[in-house]
Amino acid sequence: MFLEEYDVIVVGAGHAGSEAAAAAANLGSKTLLVTMSLQNIAQMSCNPAMGGIAKGQIVREIDALGGYSGIVSDRTAIQFKMLNKSKGPAMWSPRVQSDRMRFAEEWRMMLEGTPNLDFYQEMVKGLIIENGKIKGIRTSLGVEIRSKSVVLTNGTFLNGLIHIGEKQFGGGRAGESAATGITEDLVKAGFEAGRMKTGTPPRVDGRSLDYSKMNEEKGDAKPDKFSYSDLTKPLTQQRSCYMTYTSLNVHDILREGFDRSPMFNGRIKSLGPRYCPSIEDKINRFADKERHQLFVEPEGWNTCEVYVNGFSTSLPEDIQFKALRSVAGFENVKFFRPGYAIEYDYFPPTQLKHTLETKLVEGLYFAGQINGTTGYEEAASQGLMAGINAHLKVHEKAPLILKRDEAYIGVLIDDLITKGTEEPYRMFTSRAEYRTLLRQDNADFRLTPMSFEIGLASEDRMRRMEHKLNESEKMVAFFKETSVTVAETNPILIEKESAPISQGDKMFKVFSRPQIELEDMLKFEKVDSYIKENNLDEEIVEQAVIQVKYSGYIEKERNNADKLNRLEEVKIPENFDYNKIKSMSIEAKQKLSKIRPVTISQASRISGVSPSDISVLLIYMGR
């Protein structure tokens, strides 16, 4: 049935698996995507949205590298918002509300249109490992499929266990079976496994809600999009979301079910996402809060199904229903399906290399929730990098490893490999020490050249990026070269409560003042004329303005990154014996021996390794 060997087999067709398969196939590897259900490719198992704080930056990075998530998100969006717009550009984060059904449909169409990609529907029960190398997979029907590399992207399906009140049953997602066999094979091969938990809220009938009792949350008046390509356009119409609140009465009703809650009666022992707690966890941990926000999110253009964001729960369904009926606007709510919690297997990511290849088995890669992360975007980015690196290894090419100053994806993977995680890991802007460099507006500058070099990003993408870069640099040069007069400048400065100038000055210096915004710059006739004469779009103008207003911060961060990157150049031999260093702490020796950092810089980020330990290590490395 499968007569030839594949270059890459991807197991699981969620967000990680879809990106992994697309990347490997687009790069030229003969790729097979294996899933338990071809009808459920790229499902949005939880909220119908992509992006958000730090996550939006990741989606733009995926797009800049030639992945599909940004394009699919744009084509299936029903609302766009740029979050944190009141803060500096390092914090701006794009987010879309998505049409859940169209999202999965669009992903499948994109994958079916990808050359070199085959599909197969069946459960993978085991792995073929020979002499420490992956050789293929074994399915539930006993079919063996050979491959030079395998990417595991199993999501919440590995021995998944669903909880609703006192009921529990096996499943990887509501209505779908759990996957068995893979964990057992990996543990037998020497891998360490653990358990994690996540949850999802009930879905309800939007026709049964009274939106007049809620606050309307509209999308941006001038919506943007994720993809840097010309394959998508910004939305011309949008659907609103709504916001309402729980109350003390709602909390009292929820507490009635605590004795039947798997979270409180000991049935669930694994840790859930710290930054996305269940509603019962919120009212238990924050008992002083009189109310909690609930976001009422439509699931698409042509459905009345609604996602109740903020009400994730594993309480009994009767308690869920009774509590929701006490929420303003939900008095007559009708349930489509209850919320639930799910426990699943994961593998501590310190067992991986920065390529996402496992240290134990050559050619085997992990991506997504199997690594202990939570979120579509985190999963998709790992899948993309695993797919890229699986292809590069099979074809004996150098790996693509993103540094912490190059991408949020680099921060994510480095955190996982270097620090590990004992609870579902989600990305935040605060995790990135170089977030002024890693903005959502410049992901193409940072990453498209790398992707183009390995053959993933198209020539059209590269040309578009170069045009944007050249034109924005020309505009910055124009600001530096062009002077403004006292007469045209001071009225604007006084209006903005900024100190007036006593003589003419360069635009760059005036515009770098924090009080001056883009609309103030456009009041200068020379600026307005320059933009019109050069036919510059908003993206180019915004990029130039950011370079002017934040040049000091950007330069400082770049210098700091360059200093630390010097330590990235100091390599540590693969089998270095840390136990021979007598002046190093025992904890440092243990951590370094377990994680096996590749560079001094990575070693310095490991918890329990002190600056003095690094100094000793540098001496041993001859520095």
Swiss-Prot record:
Q: Which SUPFAM superfamilies match?
A: FAD/NAD(P)-binding domain
Keyword Glycoprotein in the entry? The reply is no
Positions bound to FAD? 12-17
Q: Does the keyword Cell inner membrane apply?
A: no
Q: Which PROSITE patterns has this protein been placed in?
A: GIDA_1, GIDA_2
- Tell me which domain of life the UniProt entry assigns to the organism this sequence originates from: Bacteria
Q: Give the principal location in a single coarse category.
A: cytoplasm
The entry's localization annotation reads: Cytoplasm
Q: Which Pfam families match?
A: GIDA, GIDA_C_1st, SAM_GIDA_C
> In Gene Ontology terms, what is one molecular function of this protein?
flavin adenine dinucleotide binding
Named cofactor requirement(s): FAD
Please provide the record's keywords in A-Z order. Cytoplasm, FAD, Flavoprotein, NAD, tRNA processing
The cellular component terms of Gene Ontology attached to this UniProt record, alphabetical and capped at eight, are:
cytosol
Q: Where does NAD(+) bind?
A: 272-286
The family database entries (HAMAP family) matched by this protein are listed as:
MnmG_GidA
Q: Which family does it belong to?
A: Belongs to the MnmG family.
Extract the PANTHER family matched here: GLUCOSE INHIBITED DIVISION PROTEIN A, PROTEIN MTO1 HOMOLOG, MITOCHONDRIAL
Function as written in the Swiss-Prot or TrEMBL entry:
NAD-binding protein involved in the addition of a carboxymethylaminomethyl (cmnm) group at the wobble position (U34) of certain tRNAs, forming tRNA-cmnm(5)s(2)U34.
Put simply, this protein is called: tRNA uridine 5-carboxymethylaminomethyl modification enzyme MnmG
Q: State the organism named in the record.
A: Flavobacterium johnsoniae (strain ATCC 17061 / DSM 2064 / JCM 8514 / BCRC 14874 / CCUG 350202 / NBRC 14942 / NCIMB 11054 / UW101)
